[in-house]
C-alpha cells in the first residue's frame, strides 16, 4: 500500500485496529513526524504527517493537500475489451487500472460465452471489481478510479458512444487481420484514445466490420498470440508512451 485512501478530506486520524492504522504501524512502522501519501477517491492527493500516536494505537495526522497535480489525473485513454472469463476479467481490471486508463468498457462478444455475463462480478452491489480498482489506487499512489460498464454487445457500445468515437483516435488490436503495427500508428496528442481488444476467442468478421465502419484502425502487437490481459497491458503501455502521458513519481519529502 503506497497510498492510504480516506473517506473524505476531513479525516485526521485512524482508530487503533483499523486496516489503515494496522498498515501504518505494523508494516510501515511509522513514528511521530513520519509522512505517508493519502488521497480521496477521485479527489485530491496529499502528504500526511503523523502528529500523534496514542498508547492505544490511534494515529493522528495532518495533511498538506496537493493543488491541481497532473500526477493524479487519469490518462485520456479508454479501454474497450471483450467479456472474458471472470478470472481473466479480474486480471484485466488489475492491469488496466494500475497502468492507467479513463474507462474500462466491456462488451459481450459474439465468440464469447454468454454465461460470463451472469457472473457475480456484474451483479449490482458486488464489490470485487471496485475492490480491484481500490487496490490499484493504493498500489499506484493515484486516487483516481476509472469508471466501468458492461454492454450487451459491441454494436450496443458503438451506438451509445458514437459521438465520443468520432472525437477519438480509435485503434482495434487484432493479431489476425491487422493493417500495421501499433508501433507505427500515430496518436494525435490533442485527441482522446480508444483502444479495442477482443475477447479470449478474438473478433468475428461482423465485429471487425462494425469497428471499421466507425473509423477504427486495426493494428497488431507483434506476431505472438497474447492473452487478453497481456494484450491490455501492452496496448495501454504503448498508447501512454505515444501520447507522452507518463510523469515521474513524486518521492515522499
For the regions a language model picked out, list residue spans one by one:
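N-terminal positively charged helical leader segments and presequences
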Residues: 1-68
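Structured adenosyl-cofactor binding patch, chiefly the S-adenosyl-L-methionine
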Residues: 205-253
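Strongly charged, low-complexity linkers/loops
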Residues: 174-189, 194
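Short Gly/Pro-enriched loop/turn and capping motifs at secondary-structure junctions
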Residues: 176-180, 200-204, 225-226
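A C-terminal functional module that forms or caps the active site or interfaces directly
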Residues: 190-210
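RNA substrate-binding interface of SAM-dependent RNA methyltransferases
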Residues: 70-171
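Glycine/charged-rich beta-loop-alpha catalytic/anionic-binding loops adjacent to active sites
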Residues: 14-16, 73-78, 191-194, 213-221
Amino acid at each position: 500500500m503506497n497510498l492510504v485512501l480516506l473517506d473524505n478530506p476531513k479525516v485526521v486520524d485512524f482508530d487503533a485496529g483499523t486496516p489503515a492504522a494496522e498498515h501504518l504501524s505494523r508494516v510501515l512502522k511509522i513514528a511521530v513526524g513520519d509522512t505517508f501519501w493519502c488521497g480521496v477517491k477521485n479527489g485530491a492527493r496529499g502528504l500526511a504527517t503523523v502528529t500523534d500516536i496514542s498508547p492505544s494505537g490511534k494515529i493522528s495526522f495532518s495533511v498538506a493537500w496537493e493543488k491541481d497535480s497532473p500526477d493524479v489525473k487519469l490518462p485520456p485513454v479508454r479501454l474497450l475489451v471483450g467479456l472474458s472469463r471472470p478470472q481473466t476479467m479480474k486480471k484485466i481490471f488489475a492491469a488496466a487500472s494500475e497502468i492507467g486508463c479513463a474507462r474500462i468498457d466491456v462488451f459481450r462478444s459474439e465468440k464469447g460465452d454468454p454465461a460470463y455475463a451472469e457472473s457475480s462480478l456484474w451483479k449490482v452491489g458486488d464489490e470485487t471489481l471496485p475492490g480491484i480498482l481500490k487496490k490499484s489506487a493504493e498500489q499506484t499512489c493515484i486516487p483516481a478510479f476509472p469508471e466501468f460498464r458492461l454492454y450487451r454487445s459491441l454494436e450496443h457500445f458503438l451506438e451509445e458512444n458514437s459521438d465520443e468515437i468520432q472525437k477519438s483516435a480509435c485503434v482495434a488490436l487484432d493479431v489476425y487481420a491487422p493493417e500495421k503495427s501499433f508501433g507505427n500508428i500515430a496518436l494525435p496528442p490533442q485527441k482522446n484514445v480508444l483502444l479495442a481488444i477482443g475477447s479470449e476467442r478474438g473478433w468475428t468478421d461482423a465485429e471487425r466490420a462494425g469497428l471499421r465502419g466507425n473509423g477504427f484502425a486495426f493494428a497488431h502487437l507483434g506476431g505472438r498470440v497474447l492473452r487478453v490481459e497481456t494484450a491490455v497491458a501492452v496496448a495501454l503501455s504503448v498508447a501512454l508512451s505515444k501520447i507522452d502521458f507518463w510523469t515521474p513519481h513524486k518521492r515522499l519529502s
